Protein backbone atom coordinates (compact mmCIF):
# COMPACT_ATOMS: atom_id res chain seq x y z
CA UNK A 1 0.00 0.00 0.00
CA UNK A 2 2.80 2.41 0.91
CA UNK A 3 4.59 1.68 -2.44
CA UNK A 4 1.46 2.55 -4.47
CA UNK A 5 1.09 5.76 -2.47
CA UNK A 6 4.76 6.57 -3.07
CA UNK A 7 4.45 6.09 -6.87
CA UNK A 8 1.29 8.18 -6.99
CA UNK A 9 2.84 11.04 -5.07
CA UNK A 10 6.10 10.81 -6.99
CA UNK A 11 4.22 11.22 -10.27
CA UNK A 12 2.34 14.25 -9.01
CA UNK A 13 3.21 17.44 -7.25
CA UNK A 14 2.64 15.86 -3.83
CA UNK A 15 6.27 15.45 -2.85
CA UNK A 16 5.74 17.72 0.19
CA UNK A 17 2.86 15.57 1.38
CA UNK A 18 4.99 12.48 0.88
CA UNK A 19 7.65 13.87 3.18
CA UNK A 20 5.06 14.62 5.84
CA UNK A 21 3.73 11.06 5.67
CA UNK A 22 7.23 9.59 5.84
CA UNK A 23 8.00 11.67 8.90
CA UNK A 24 4.71 10.82 10.59
CA UNK A 25 4.66 7.04 10.12
CA UNK A 26 7.60 6.29 12.49
CA UNK A 27 5.83 8.27 15.22
CA UNK A 28 2.72 6.14 14.76
CA UNK A 29 4.77 3.00 15.19
CA UNK A 30 6.37 4.27 18.41
CA UNK A 31 3.12 4.51 20.37
CA UNK A 32 3.27 2.02 23.23
CA UNK A 33 0.07 -0.03 23.42
CA UNK A 34 0.30 -3.06 25.72
CA UNK A 35 -0.83 -6.45 24.52
CA UNK A 36 -4.58 -6.72 24.91
CA UNK A 37 -5.95 -8.64 27.85
CA UNK A 38 -9.13 -9.15 25.86
CA UNK A 39 -8.10 -9.47 22.23
CA UNK A 40 -11.39 -11.14 21.31
CA UNK A 41 -13.22 -7.89 21.95
CA UNK A 42 -10.76 -5.97 19.79
CA UNK A 43 -11.18 -8.40 16.90
CA UNK A 44 -14.94 -7.83 16.78
CA UNK A 45 -14.62 -4.10 17.39
CA UNK A 46 -15.90 -4.00 20.97
CA UNK A 47 -14.66 -1.32 23.35
CA UNK A 48 -12.74 -2.79 26.28
CA UNK A 49 -12.18 -0.28 29.08
CA UNK A 50 -9.36 -2.11 30.94
CA UNK A 51 -7.40 -2.47 27.71
CA UNK A 52 -7.99 1.16 26.79
CA UNK A 53 -6.82 2.51 30.13
CA UNK A 54 -3.92 0.07 30.38
CA UNK A 55 -2.56 1.80 27.30
CA UNK A 56 -3.17 5.24 28.77
CA UNK A 57 -1.49 4.32 32.07
CA UNK A 58 1.47 2.76 30.25
CA UNK A 59 2.04 6.03 28.42
CA UNK A 60 1.67 8.32 31.44
CA UNK A 61 4.76 10.51 31.74
CA UNK A 62 5.30 9.99 35.48
CA UNK A 63 7.90 12.73 35.49
CA UNK A 64 8.96 12.00 39.08
CA UNK A 65 8.95 8.20 39.01
CA UNK A 66 12.07 7.48 41.06
CA UNK A 67 14.83 5.68 39.15
CA UNK A 68 17.91 6.73 41.11
CA UNK A 69 20.17 4.75 43.41
CA UNK A 70 22.24 7.19 45.46
CA UNK A 71 21.54 9.58 48.31
CA UNK A 72 22.29 12.45 45.95
CA UNK A 73 19.74 11.11 43.45
CA UNK A 74 17.17 10.82 46.22
CA UNK A 75 17.68 14.31 47.62
CA UNK A 76 17.56 15.95 44.19
CA UNK A 77 14.42 14.01 43.24
CA UNK A 78 12.59 14.75 46.49
CA UNK A 79 13.44 18.45 46.40
CA UNK A 80 11.91 18.74 42.93
CA UNK A 81 8.92 16.45 43.45
CA UNK A 82 7.37 17.70 46.71
CA UNK A 83 6.48 21.24 45.53
CA UNK A 84 4.99 19.81 42.33
CA UNK A 85 2.81 17.40 44.31
CA UNK A 86 1.63 20.17 46.62
CA UNK A 87 0.78 22.28 43.60
CA UNK A 88 -1.22 19.46 42.02
CA UNK A 89 -3.17 18.98 45.26
CA UNK A 90 -4.00 22.69 45.37
CA UNK A 91 -2.00 23.35 48.53
CA UNK A 92 -0.16 26.23 46.89
CA UNK A 93 -3.53 27.97 46.46
CA UNK A 94 -4.44 27.45 50.11
CA UNK A 95 -1.00 28.58 51.28
CA UNK A 96 -1.16 31.75 49.19
CA UNK A 97 -4.72 32.61 50.18
CA UNK A 98 -4.24 31.96 53.90
CA UNK A 99 -0.57 32.84 54.37
CA UNK A 100 -1.32 35.08 57.34
CA UNK A 101 -4.27 33.07 58.67
CA UNK A 102 -4.01 31.57 62.16
CA UNK A 103 -6.69 28.97 62.89
CA UNK A 104 -8.85 29.52 65.93
CA UNK A 105 -10.38 26.73 67.99
CA UNK A 106 -13.17 26.41 70.52
CA UNK A 107 -13.78 23.63 73.03
CA UNK A 108 -17.42 22.49 73.13
CA UNK A 109 -17.38 19.88 75.90
CA UNK A 110 -15.15 17.76 78.12
CA UNK A 111 -15.67 14.43 79.88
CA UNK A 112 -13.69 12.00 82.00
CA UNK A 113 -13.63 8.54 80.41
CA UNK A 114 -11.65 6.85 83.16
CA UNK A 115 -8.30 6.44 81.37
CA UNK A 116 -8.31 9.84 79.62
CA UNK A 117 -10.08 13.17 79.19
CA UNK A 118 -12.17 13.37 76.02
CA UNK A 119 -12.83 16.86 74.63
CA UNK A 120 -14.96 17.96 71.68
CA UNK A 121 -13.55 20.89 69.70
CA UNK A 122 -14.06 22.97 66.59
CA UNK A 123 -11.11 24.35 64.67
CA UNK A 124 -11.50 26.82 61.81
CA UNK A 125 -8.96 25.48 59.34
CA UNK A 126 -10.23 28.11 56.91
CA UNK A 127 -12.35 31.11 57.92
CA UNK A 128 -15.43 29.30 56.56
CA UNK A 129 -14.52 25.74 57.60
CA UNK A 130 -15.28 24.86 61.24
CA UNK A 131 -13.85 21.35 61.46
CA UNK A 132 -14.92 19.17 64.41
CA UNK A 133 -12.27 17.14 66.18
CA UNK A 134 -12.00 15.13 69.37
CA UNK A 135 -8.95 15.50 71.59
CA UNK A 136 -8.04 12.69 73.97
CA UNK A 137 -5.70 13.78 76.75
CA UNK A 138 -3.83 11.22 78.84
CA UNK A 139 -4.37 11.94 82.50
CA UNK A 140 -1.52 13.77 84.24
CA UNK A 141 -0.12 14.79 80.86
CA UNK A 142 2.05 17.62 82.12
CA UNK A 143 5.26 16.57 80.41
CA UNK A 144 5.78 16.75 76.63
CA UNK A 145 4.65 13.62 74.85
CA UNK A 146 3.94 12.44 71.33
CA UNK A 147 0.89 13.36 69.27
CA UNK A 148 -1.17 10.97 67.14
CA UNK A 149 -3.61 12.35 64.56
CA UNK A 150 -6.06 9.73 63.32
CA UNK A 151 -8.14 10.71 60.27
CA UNK A 152 -11.06 8.38 59.55
CA UNK A 153 -12.30 6.94 56.27
CA UNK A 154 -15.77 6.50 54.79
CA UNK A 155 -18.20 6.25 57.68
CA UNK A 156 -21.31 8.08 58.83
CA UNK A 157 -19.90 8.04 62.36
CA UNK A 158 -17.03 10.52 62.38
CA UNK A 159 -16.41 9.88 66.10
CA UNK A 160 -15.83 6.14 65.86
CA UNK A 161 -12.05 6.47 66.25
CA UNK A 162 -12.62 8.25 69.56
CA UNK A 163 -14.68 5.36 70.95
CA UNK A 164 -18.11 6.94 70.47
CA UNK A 165 -20.69 4.53 69.05
CA UNK A 166 -24.28 5.02 67.92
CA UNK A 167 -25.37 1.46 68.73
CA UNK A 168 -24.15 -1.73 70.32
CA UNK A 169 -23.87 -3.26 66.86
CA UNK A 170 -21.58 -0.42 65.83
CA UNK A 171 -19.54 -0.88 68.99
CA UNK A 172 -19.09 -4.59 68.32
CA UNK A 173 -18.13 -3.96 64.70
CA UNK A 174 -15.77 -1.13 65.61
CA UNK A 175 -14.00 -3.10 68.31
CA UNK A 176 -13.74 -6.21 66.14
CA UNK A 177 -12.18 -4.16 63.35
CA UNK A 178 -9.95 -2.30 65.84
CA UNK A 179 -11.24 1.03 64.55
CA UNK A 180 -11.02 2.90 67.88
CA UNK A 181 -7.68 4.25 66.68
CA UNK A 182 -7.55 7.39 68.85
CA UNK A 183 -8.49 5.35 71.93
CA UNK A 184 -5.61 2.99 71.17
CA UNK A 185 -3.28 5.98 70.82
CA UNK A 186 -4.18 7.59 74.13
CA UNK A 187 -3.82 4.24 75.88
CA UNK A 188 -0.31 4.10 74.40
CA UNK A 189 0.37 7.38 76.19
CA UNK A 190 0.02 9.89 73.34
CA UNK A 191 -2.16 12.92 72.86
CA UNK A 192 -4.69 11.78 70.28
CA UNK A 193 -6.71 13.88 67.85
CA UNK A 194 -9.59 12.29 65.92
CA UNK A 195 -10.67 14.89 63.35
CA UNK A 196 -13.66 14.83 61.07
CA UNK A 197 -12.42 14.16 57.56
CA UNK A 198 -13.59 17.04 55.38
CA UNK A 199 -16.67 16.07 53.37
CA UNK A 200 -18.08 13.94 56.21
CA UNK A 201 -20.21 14.61 59.28
CA UNK A 202 -20.88 18.28 59.86
CA UNK A 203 -18.76 19.19 56.84
CA UNK A 204 -21.21 17.60 54.41
CA UNK A 205 -23.51 19.82 52.37
CA UNK A 206 -26.83 20.69 53.98
CA UNK A 207 -28.59 18.68 51.28
CA UNK A 208 -26.51 15.59 52.06
CA UNK A 209 -27.09 16.04 55.79
CA UNK A 210 -30.86 16.09 55.17
CA UNK A 211 -30.58 12.97 53.01
CA UNK A 212 -28.35 11.31 55.63
CA UNK A 213 -25.75 10.64 52.94
CA UNK A 214 -22.47 9.20 54.15
CA UNK A 215 -20.44 12.00 52.61
CA UNK A 216 -20.32 14.95 50.24
CA UNK A 217 -17.12 13.76 48.58
CA UNK A 218 -18.38 14.11 45.01
CA UNK A 219 -19.60 17.66 45.54
CA UNK A 220 -16.35 18.55 47.29
CA UNK A 221 -14.30 17.21 44.38
CA UNK A 222 -16.35 18.89 41.66
CA UNK A 223 -16.35 22.28 43.35
CA UNK A 224 -12.67 22.05 44.31
CA UNK A 225 -11.39 21.28 40.82
CA UNK A 226 -13.08 24.39 39.46
CA UNK A 227 -10.44 26.43 41.29
CA UNK A 228 -7.50 24.02 41.18
CA UNK A 229 -8.04 22.40 44.56
CA UNK A 230 -8.74 18.77 45.55
CA UNK A 231 -10.38 16.98 48.49
CA UNK A 232 -7.07 15.28 49.31
CA UNK A 233 -5.35 18.67 49.34
CA UNK A 234 -8.06 20.09 51.60
CA UNK A 235 -7.67 17.20 54.02
CA UNK A 236 -3.88 17.51 54.07
CA UNK A 237 -4.35 21.21 54.85
CA UNK A 238 -6.65 20.30 57.76
CA UNK A 239 -4.03 17.94 59.21
CA UNK A 240 -1.38 20.67 58.97
CA UNK A 241 -3.63 23.18 60.74
CA UNK A 242 -4.29 20.65 63.51
CA UNK A 243 -0.54 20.25 63.94
CA UNK A 244 -0.18 24.05 64.10
CA UNK A 245 -2.85 24.20 66.80
CA UNK A 246 -1.45 21.28 68.80
CA UNK A 247 2.07 22.73 68.80
CA UNK A 248 0.72 26.05 70.06
CA UNK A 249 -1.68 24.68 72.70
CA UNK A 250 -0.50 21.29 73.97
CA UNK A 251 2.73 20.06 75.59
CA UNK A 252 3.57 18.05 72.47
CA UNK A 253 7.00 16.62 71.78
CA UNK A 254 7.36 18.06 68.29
CA UNK A 255 9.77 15.30 67.27
CA UNK A 256 7.04 12.70 67.86
CA UNK A 257 4.10 13.36 65.55
CA UNK A 258 2.30 10.33 64.13
CA UNK A 259 -0.50 10.15 61.57
CA UNK A 260 -2.44 6.93 61.07
CA UNK A 261 -5.86 6.06 59.69
CA UNK A 262 -7.70 3.36 57.81
CA UNK A 263 -8.87 3.35 54.18
CA UNK A 264 -9.74 6.98 53.35
CA UNK A 265 -7.87 7.84 56.55
CA UNK A 266 -4.91 6.00 55.10
CA UNK A 267 -5.13 8.21 52.02
CA UNK A 268 -4.96 11.32 54.18
CA UNK A 269 -2.12 9.80 56.20
CA UNK A 270 0.06 9.10 53.17
CA UNK A 271 -0.45 12.43 51.42
CA UNK A 272 -0.20 14.50 54.62
CA UNK A 273 3.13 12.91 55.53
CA UNK A 274 4.39 13.37 51.96
CA UNK A 275 3.62 17.10 52.12
CA UNK A 276 4.21 18.07 55.78
CA UNK A 277 7.68 17.13 57.00
CA UNK A 278 6.74 17.80 60.64
CA UNK A 279 5.08 14.38 60.65
CA UNK A 280 7.58 11.98 62.20
CA UNK A 281 5.95 8.62 61.45
CA UNK A 282 3.24 7.64 58.95
CA UNK A 283 1.20 4.43 59.18
CA UNK A 284 -1.56 4.25 56.56
CA UNK A 285 -3.85 1.22 56.80
CA UNK A 286 -5.75 -0.38 53.92
CA UNK A 287 -4.63 2.15 51.33
CA UNK A 288 -1.01 1.81 50.15
CA UNK A 289 -1.11 0.19 46.72
CA UNK A 290 -0.60 1.19 43.10
CA UNK A 291 -2.90 3.77 41.56
CA UNK A 292 -3.34 1.57 38.48
CA UNK A 293 -4.21 -1.54 40.51
CA UNK A 294 -6.66 0.16 42.86
CA UNK A 295 -8.41 3.44 42.05
CA UNK A 296 -7.40 3.09 38.38
CA UNK A 297 -9.19 -0.22 37.89
CA UNK A 298 -11.62 -0.74 40.80
CA UNK A 299 -14.59 1.45 41.74
CA UNK A 300 -13.73 3.96 44.48
CA UNK A 301 -15.14 7.16 45.92
CA UNK A 302 -14.44 10.29 43.88
CA UNK A 303 -12.43 11.82 46.72
CA UNK A 304 -9.53 9.47 45.93
CA UNK A 305 -8.76 11.17 42.64
CA UNK A 306 -6.23 13.90 41.93
CA UNK A 307 -6.39 15.06 38.30
CA UNK A 308 -3.08 14.35 36.60
CA UNK A 309 -1.44 12.52 39.51
CA UNK A 310 0.07 9.84 37.25
CA UNK A 311 1.78 12.50 35.17
CA UNK A 312 3.94 12.93 38.29
CA UNK A 313 4.30 9.38 39.60
CA UNK A 314 2.78 6.29 41.16
CA UNK A 315 1.63 5.98 44.77
CA UNK A 316 4.98 4.58 45.86
CA UNK A 317 6.66 7.71 44.52
CA UNK A 318 4.32 9.86 46.61
CA UNK A 319 5.12 7.71 49.65
CA UNK A 320 8.80 8.15 48.85
CA UNK A 321 8.46 11.81 49.80
CA UNK A 322 8.06 10.59 53.39
CA UNK A 323 11.58 9.14 53.39
CA UNK A 324 13.78 9.07 55.38
CA UNK A 325 11.03 9.29 58.02
CA UNK A 326 9.56 5.93 59.14
CA UNK A 327 6.67 4.57 57.06
CA UNK A 328 4.68 1.39 57.59
CA UNK A 329 1.91 0.26 55.24
CA UNK A 330 -0.58 -1.90 57.13
CA UNK A 331 -2.64 -4.04 54.79
CA UNK A 332 -5.01 -7.00 54.77
CA UNK A 333 -4.15 -9.98 52.58
CA UNK A 334 -7.82 -10.29 51.58
CA UNK A 335 -8.42 -6.61 50.76
CA UNK A 336 -10.57 -6.57 47.62
CA UNK A 337 -10.38 -2.87 46.76
CA UNK A 338 -6.66 -2.35 47.36
CA UNK A 339 -5.29 -5.76 46.29
CA UNK A 340 -2.33 -7.02 48.30
CA UNK A 341 -0.45 -8.07 45.13
CA UNK A 342 -0.43 -4.44 44.01
CA UNK A 343 0.57 -3.31 47.52
CA UNK A 344 3.56 -5.64 47.40
CA UNK A 345 4.52 -4.31 43.99
CA UNK A 346 4.30 -0.73 45.28
CA UNK A 347 6.32 -1.64 48.36
CA UNK A 348 9.15 -3.08 46.25
CA UNK A 349 9.47 0.30 44.52
CA UNK A 350 9.21 2.20 47.81
CA UNK A 351 11.97 0.03 49.29
CA UNK A 352 14.25 1.17 46.46
CA UNK A 353 13.59 4.79 47.42
CA UNK A 354 14.28 4.19 51.11
CA UNK A 355 17.43 2.27 50.20
CA UNK A 356 18.66 5.19 48.12
CA UNK A 357 17.89 7.46 51.08
CA UNK A 358 20.15 5.26 53.22
CA UNK A 359 17.40 3.97 55.53
CA UNK A 360 15.98 0.73 54.07
CA UNK A 361 14.80 -0.40 57.50
CA UNK A 362 12.60 2.68 57.94
CA UNK A 363 9.86 1.29 55.70
CA UNK A 364 7.81 -1.83 56.33
CA UNK A 365 4.79 -3.65 54.93
CA UNK A 366 2.67 -5.36 57.58
CA UNK A 367 0.22 -7.91 56.20
CA UNK A 368 -2.89 -8.67 58.26
CA UNK A 369 -4.72 -11.96 57.82
CA UNK A 370 -8.10 -10.48 56.88
CA UNK A 371 -9.47 -7.83 54.54
CA UNK A 372 -10.07 -4.07 54.46
CA UNK A 373 -9.67 -3.08 58.12
CA UNK A 374 -7.25 -1.65 60.70
CA UNK A 375 -4.56 -3.88 62.22
CA UNK A 376 -3.27 -2.37 65.45
CA UNK A 377 -0.61 -5.07 65.85
CA UNK A 378 1.09 -3.65 62.79
CA UNK A 379 0.88 -0.06 64.02
CA UNK A 380 1.91 0.53 67.61
CA UNK A 381 5.05 -1.66 67.80
CA UNK A 382 6.34 0.12 64.68
CA UNK A 383 5.47 3.55 66.10
CA UNK A 384 7.03 2.77 69.48
CA UNK A 385 10.22 1.40 67.93
CA UNK A 386 10.83 4.45 65.77
CA UNK A 387 9.70 7.15 68.19
CA UNK A 388 12.02 5.70 70.82
CA UNK A 389 14.86 6.55 68.45
CA UNK A 390 13.81 10.22 68.48
CA UNK A 391 15.44 11.98 71.40
CA UNK A 392 13.29 14.13 73.66
Outline where the language-model segments fall:
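N-terminal cap/lid segment of alpha/beta-hydrolase-fold proteins
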Residues: 93-142
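Cap/lid segment of the alpha/beta-hydrolase catalytic domain
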Residues: 143, 149-240, 247-248, 293-298
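Mobile cap/lid helix-loop segments that gate and shape the active-site cleft of serine hydrolases
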Residues: 219-227, 241, 279-320, 324, ...
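Alpha/beta-hydrolase fold nucleophile elbow
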Residues: 251-262
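Gly/Ala-rich beta-loop-alpha elbow adjacent to hydrolase catalytic centers
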Residues: 261-265, 269
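Short beta-strand/loop motif that positions the catalytic acidic residue
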Residues: 322, 329-331
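Acidic catalytic loop of the alpha/beta-hydrolase fold
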Residues: 334-338, 372-373
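C-terminal catalytic histidine-bearing segment of alpha/beta-hydrolase fold enzymes
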Residues: 348-392
